[in-house]
Amino acid sequence: MSINRNHQFYKLVFEGILLTMFFSLYSCSNNDNEAVDVIPPSSYDSLKPIGFGENTTGGNNQNITVVTNAEQLAEAVSGANPATIYVQGDITLDNMLAVGSNKSIIGLYGATISNLNCNENAGIFLLKGSNNVIIRNLTLLGPGAYDIDANYSDNISLVGAKNVWVDHCDIQDGIDGNFDIVEGSDSICVSWTRFRYLIAPKGGGSGGSDDHRNCNLIGNSNNTADLDAGHLNCTFICCWWGDGCSERCPRVRFGKVRVVNCLYDGNDFKYCVGYGVYSNIYVEKCAFVSEKAKKKALKDYRGDKDFNIKVVDCLGIDDVELSQGEWGQFVPNYDYKAFNADMVESVLKNSENGAGATLKILL
């Protein structure tokens, strides 16, 4: 026991020395307000959007600002002028923020944004018609699942948004959902992001559900082909659906969606991936490790007749290809070298550089 304690002590001392050195060097040499990640990222991390969303550049290091409160953040994310916004500390919102175009919203190490309202003022970021937005390295906290049947009350809501990259976020306890992509949104990449519910669900909301821990909805109606056909194309890379997630991880209508190197280890799944009307889904080298995830991996949602889903080289479930309708299976043709499914859990759960808001970004 004493050897283990000594080992941990010296490990902490060494890490402290390293961080002190980085802080010292950075304060002396970095005077242009560019951020640095002081802990090396995972060797599997591309550090850029891949596939759908690959052309997203966000604020492109222009008009750099640091925000520390809700008023500053609301002002910084508005409008269409390019801006790179660093979030410092803990920010609490009273209502959802409308995010404009050409923005990078990046959390410095440990940054959180929360909105704990259980009403129509719930939600954190609304991207309605926005284009070219990056959201990175933020912990986003909602009040817990409570079905109030409100539009756009998720921690992140994309409504007709294009070219969006969400990377290394920890998205928790959304009131309606954690992160929904609807109404013709397109070219979306979600990478290295953790989804979970740590607050017990609350019943009695106007929507009627007693357990609305429904994480990621892609397409919110079967009757929106005029908006959604040819859109809702998304890539999920190295994402982790865990504690408390019940369903919609994701649940897809209309879009082409690739889910690759993702982890499912929660114990509350009613299902993991839901395939609905005109969905075209490619699930590749993912790890379904909990018993619930293995048994409830896929769901044919309400008997929709036009869909394609293919599962390839995953851990915990068999390969399968299911198809109804006259169109062909979507096969990704963009460059991403997926690693083996039996490595997914250890890579994504690495506390130093795995999925979630793990980037040690400093200014």
Place the predicted regions along the sequence by residue.
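Bacterial N-terminal signal peptides that target proteins for export
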Residues: 2-15
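Extracellular beta-strand-rich solenoid/capping regions of secreted or surface-exposed proteins
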Residues: 74-82, 89-106, 113-136, 142-162
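Acidic Gly/Asp/Thr-rich repetitive segments characteristic of extracellular carbohydrate-active
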Residues: 50-86
